[in-house]
Design a protein with these regions (language model features):
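Heptad-repeat positions
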Residues: 180, 187, 194, 201-204, ...
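Short loop/turn motifs that connect adjacent beta-strands in outer-membrane beta-barrel proteins
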Residues: 1-2, 43, 83-95, 125-128, ...
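Short glycine/proline- and aromatic-enriched beta-strand/turn motifs that initiate or cap beta-hairpins
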Residues: 1-37
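Outer-membrane beta-barrel proteins
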Residues: 14-20, 57-61, 86, 107-111, ...
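Gram-negative (and chloroplast) outer-membrane scaffold detector with strong preference
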Residues: 42-115
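Residue-level detector of the transmembrane beta-barrel scaffold of outer-membrane proteins
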Residues: 4-6, 45-47, 95-99, 130-132, ...
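Predominantly the C-terminal beta-signal and adjacent terminal strand-loop region
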Residues: 59-63, 126-199
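Residues on the lipid-exposed face of transmembrane beta-strands in outer-membrane beta-barrel proteins
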Residues: 7-11, 34-38, 75-81, 100-104, ...
Protein backbone atom coordinates (compact mmCIF):
# COMPACT_ATOMS: atom_id res chain seq x y z
CA UNK A 1 0.00 0.00 0.00
CA UNK A 2 0.98 3.68 0.49
CA UNK A 3 0.70 4.41 -3.24
CA UNK A 4 -0.06 8.01 -4.15
CA UNK A 5 -0.67 10.36 -7.08
CA UNK A 6 -0.06 14.09 -7.02
CA UNK A 7 -0.77 17.11 -9.19
CA UNK A 8 1.10 20.40 -8.85
CA UNK A 9 0.85 23.67 -10.71
CA UNK A 10 3.03 26.75 -10.59
CA UNK A 11 5.71 28.61 -12.50
CA UNK A 12 9.26 28.00 -13.64
CA UNK A 13 12.17 30.12 -14.83
CA UNK A 14 14.61 29.04 -17.54
CA UNK A 15 18.32 29.75 -17.10
CA UNK A 16 20.45 29.57 -20.24
CA UNK A 17 22.54 31.75 -22.53
CA UNK A 18 21.51 35.41 -22.39
CA UNK A 19 18.79 34.77 -19.74
CA UNK A 20 20.54 37.21 -17.42
CA UNK A 21 20.19 39.91 -20.09
CA UNK A 22 16.40 39.59 -20.10
CA UNK A 23 13.89 40.72 -17.52
CA UNK A 24 13.29 37.96 -14.99
CA UNK A 25 9.51 38.09 -15.49
CA UNK A 26 10.04 37.23 -19.17
CA UNK A 27 11.79 33.97 -18.24
CA UNK A 28 8.79 32.72 -16.23
CA UNK A 29 6.29 30.26 -17.72
CA UNK A 30 3.48 28.00 -16.48
CA UNK A 31 4.61 24.71 -14.92
CA UNK A 32 2.29 21.67 -14.49
CA UNK A 33 3.58 18.48 -12.84
CA UNK A 34 2.00 15.04 -12.35
CA UNK A 35 3.49 12.18 -10.34
CA UNK A 36 2.79 8.67 -9.08
CA UNK A 37 4.79 7.02 -6.32
CA UNK A 38 4.98 4.79 -3.28
CA UNK A 39 6.26 5.25 0.28
CA UNK A 40 8.13 2.12 1.32
CA UNK A 41 8.39 3.14 4.98
CA UNK A 42 7.58 6.32 6.95
CA UNK A 43 10.68 8.14 5.79
CA UNK A 44 11.55 7.13 2.21
CA UNK A 45 9.86 6.45 -1.09
CA UNK A 46 10.11 6.73 -4.87
CA UNK A 47 8.07 8.65 -7.40
CA UNK A 48 7.85 8.95 -11.18
CA UNK A 49 7.15 12.55 -12.16
CA UNK A 50 6.42 14.12 -15.52
CA UNK A 51 5.67 17.59 -16.77
CA UNK A 52 6.00 19.97 -19.66
CA UNK A 53 5.02 23.29 -21.07
CA UNK A 54 7.03 26.11 -22.56
CA UNK A 55 10.47 27.62 -21.98
CA UNK A 56 11.55 31.17 -22.72
CA UNK A 57 15.08 31.43 -24.08
CA UNK A 58 16.78 34.51 -25.50
CA UNK A 59 19.20 35.49 -28.23
CA UNK A 60 22.20 37.78 -27.69
CA UNK A 61 21.38 40.86 -25.59
CA UNK A 62 17.86 39.46 -25.17
CA UNK A 63 17.03 40.85 -28.59
CA UNK A 64 14.54 38.07 -29.30
CA UNK A 65 12.63 35.64 -27.09
CA UNK A 66 12.42 31.97 -28.05
CA UNK A 67 9.18 30.21 -27.06
CA UNK A 68 10.00 26.50 -26.88
CA UNK A 69 7.76 23.58 -25.91
CA UNK A 70 9.25 20.72 -23.91
CA UNK A 71 8.44 17.58 -21.92
CA UNK A 72 10.36 15.87 -19.14
CA UNK A 73 10.16 12.79 -16.92
CA UNK A 74 12.22 11.82 -13.90
CA UNK A 75 12.36 9.30 -11.08
CA UNK A 76 13.06 10.70 -7.61
CA UNK A 77 14.20 9.30 -4.29
CA UNK A 78 12.21 11.05 -1.53
CA UNK A 79 13.18 11.30 2.15
CA UNK A 80 10.89 12.52 4.94
CA UNK A 81 13.22 14.36 7.31
CA UNK A 82 10.91 14.70 10.30
CA UNK A 83 9.75 11.08 10.11
CA UNK A 84 13.42 10.03 9.82
CA UNK A 85 14.81 11.96 12.79
CA UNK A 86 11.73 11.80 15.05
CA UNK A 87 9.72 8.86 16.33
CA UNK A 88 7.12 7.72 13.81
CA UNK A 89 3.71 9.20 14.53
CA UNK A 90 0.81 8.23 12.21
CA UNK A 91 -1.04 11.40 13.26
CA UNK A 92 1.83 13.74 12.33
CA UNK A 93 0.54 16.55 10.12
CA UNK A 94 3.70 18.12 8.69
CA UNK A 95 6.84 16.83 7.04
CA UNK A 96 9.73 18.20 4.98
CA UNK A 97 10.75 16.01 2.05
CA UNK A 98 13.93 16.62 0.06
CA UNK A 99 14.20 14.66 -3.19
CA UNK A 100 16.82 13.85 -5.80
CA UNK A 101 16.66 11.97 -9.07
CA UNK A 102 17.52 11.60 -12.72
CA UNK A 103 15.48 11.63 -15.90
CA UNK A 104 15.19 12.90 -19.43
CA UNK A 105 13.93 15.92 -21.36
CA UNK A 106 12.90 16.44 -24.96
CA UNK A 107 12.34 19.50 -27.16
CA UNK A 108 11.67 19.00 -30.86
CA UNK A 109 14.64 16.92 -32.03
CA UNK A 110 16.74 17.60 -28.93
CA UNK A 111 16.94 15.15 -26.03
CA UNK A 112 18.91 15.46 -22.84
CA UNK A 113 19.73 13.54 -19.68
CA UNK A 114 18.61 15.52 -16.61
CA UNK A 115 19.56 15.76 -12.96
CA UNK A 116 16.64 16.72 -10.77
CA UNK A 117 16.32 17.80 -7.14
CA UNK A 118 14.42 19.96 -4.71
CA UNK A 119 12.46 20.08 -1.48
CA UNK A 120 8.79 19.65 -0.61
CA UNK A 121 6.80 20.81 2.40
CA UNK A 122 3.61 18.79 2.90
CA UNK A 123 0.66 19.03 5.28
CA UNK A 124 -1.73 16.16 6.00
CA UNK A 125 -5.32 17.31 5.40
CA UNK A 126 -6.94 13.89 5.87
CA UNK A 127 -6.14 10.19 5.58
CA UNK A 128 -6.36 10.47 1.80
CA UNK A 129 -5.12 13.99 0.99
CA UNK A 130 -1.99 16.09 1.55
CA UNK A 131 -1.39 19.68 0.47
CA UNK A 132 2.14 20.49 -0.61
CA UNK A 133 4.46 23.25 -1.79
CA UNK A 134 7.48 22.20 -3.81
CA UNK A 135 10.62 23.90 -5.07
CA UNK A 136 12.59 21.99 -7.68
CA UNK A 137 15.48 22.47 -10.03
CA UNK A 138 16.70 20.65 -13.11
CA UNK A 139 20.03 20.68 -14.98
CA UNK A 140 20.24 19.50 -18.59
CA UNK A 141 22.28 19.68 -21.80
CA UNK A 142 23.61 23.04 -22.96
CA UNK A 143 22.42 22.33 -26.51
CA UNK A 144 18.73 22.67 -25.66
CA UNK A 145 18.81 26.35 -26.70
CA UNK A 146 22.19 27.68 -27.83
CA UNK A 147 25.66 26.35 -27.09
CA UNK A 148 27.95 28.63 -25.12
CA UNK A 149 27.83 30.72 -22.00
CA UNK A 150 26.60 28.41 -19.24
CA UNK A 151 28.15 24.92 -19.21
CA UNK A 152 24.60 23.57 -18.77
CA UNK A 153 21.08 24.94 -19.00
CA UNK A 154 18.81 24.90 -15.98
CA UNK A 155 15.21 25.17 -14.91
CA UNK A 156 13.87 26.22 -11.52
CA UNK A 157 10.25 25.98 -10.47
CA UNK A 158 7.89 26.64 -7.57
CA UNK A 159 4.58 24.75 -7.47
CA UNK A 160 1.71 23.95 -5.13
CA UNK A 161 -0.69 21.05 -5.29
CA UNK A 162 -2.36 18.06 -3.66
CA UNK A 163 -1.42 14.43 -3.15
CA UNK A 164 -4.00 11.63 -3.03
CA UNK A 165 -3.17 8.42 -1.16
CA UNK A 166 -4.91 5.21 -2.09
CA UNK A 167 -6.50 3.02 0.57
CA UNK A 168 -4.04 1.57 3.03
CA UNK A 169 -1.98 4.61 3.95
CA UNK A 170 0.20 4.38 7.04
CA UNK A 171 2.53 1.93 8.75
CA UNK A 172 2.28 -0.32 11.78
CA UNK A 173 4.77 0.34 14.56
CA UNK A 174 6.94 -2.68 15.30
CA UNK A 175 7.03 -3.83 18.96
CA UNK A 176 10.08 -2.89 21.01
CA UNK A 177 12.92 -5.41 21.21
CA UNK A 178 12.49 -5.75 24.98
CA UNK A 179 8.89 -6.89 24.49
CA UNK A 180 9.97 -9.37 21.82
CA UNK A 181 12.70 -10.76 24.10
CA UNK A 182 10.24 -11.10 26.99
CA UNK A 183 7.77 -13.03 24.82
CA UNK A 184 10.55 -15.28 23.52
CA UNK A 185 11.66 -16.07 27.09
CA UNK A 186 8.08 -16.91 28.11
CA UNK A 187 7.71 -19.21 25.10
CA UNK A 188 10.96 -20.96 26.03
CA UNK A 189 9.70 -21.59 29.58
CA UNK A 190 6.48 -23.08 28.20
CA UNK A 191 8.41 -25.26 25.76
CA UNK A 192 10.60 -26.60 28.59
CA UNK A 193 7.55 -27.40 30.69
CA UNK A 194 5.97 -29.31 27.80
CA UNK A 195 9.20 -31.27 27.30
CA UNK A 196 9.35 -32.15 31.01
CA UNK A 197 5.76 -33.40 30.95
CA UNK A 198 6.43 -35.50 27.85
CA UNK A 199 9.53 -37.10 29.43
CA UNK A 200 7.94 -37.80 32.83
CA UNK A 201 7.56 -41.58 33.44
CA UNK A 202 4.00 -42.80 33.72
CA UNK A 203 2.61 -43.14 37.21
CA UNK A 204 1.59 -46.71 38.15
CA UNK A 205 -1.35 -47.00 40.45
CA UNK A 206 -2.04 -50.27 42.32
CA UNK A 207 -5.70 -50.94 42.64
CA UNK A 208 -6.74 -53.52 45.26
CA UNK A 209 -10.03 -55.22 44.62
CA UNK A 210 -12.12 -55.72 47.70
CA UNK A 211 -14.52 -58.64 47.59
CA UNK A 212 -17.56 -58.38 49.78
CA UNK A 213 -19.10 -61.72 50.68
CA UNK A 214 -22.62 -62.10 52.04
CA UNK A 215 -22.91 -63.13 55.67
CA UNK A 216 -24.07 -66.72 56.05
CA UNK A 217 -26.86 -67.26 58.52
CA UNK A 218 -27.36 -70.56 60.37
Amino acid sequence: HNWFVSANFGANAFFAEHSSQAKFKNTITFMPELAVGKMFNPWWGLRLQGGGGALHGFTDNAGSMLHMHYMHMNIDFMMGLINFFAKYNPDRKFDIVPFFGVGGMTRKHQQSFTIHGGIQAKYKISERFDANIEFQGMIFNDKMVETGGFPNDGLGGLTAGVTYYFKGRGFRTAPKQAVIDEMAAANLVLANQVTQLQNRPPEIKVIEKEVVRPVETK
